């Protein structure tokens, strides 16, 4: 049986659960790329998404 001091030192008494982030951080390799799209098509896509977001 462990003494209370050893338990405190091991963190078994004051164990605080880790806070979860709302959105998991994406690694650069996980960001979806738009292959085969021209710059103007990508611009239109992002402008459309931004407009939808502002009105929602």
From Swiss-Prot:
<comment type="similarity">
    <text>Belongs to the ninE family.</text>
</comment>
<protein>
    <recommendedName>
        <fullName>Protein ninE</fullName>
    </recommendedName>
</protein>
């Amino acid at each position: 049986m462990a003494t209370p001091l050893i338990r405190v030192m091991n963190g078994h008494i004051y164990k605080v659960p880790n806070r979860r982030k709302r959105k998991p951080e994406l690694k650069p390799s996980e960001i979806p790329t738009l292959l085969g799209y021209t710059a103007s098509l990508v611009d239109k896509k992002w402008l459309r998404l931004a407009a939808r977001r502002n009105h929602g």
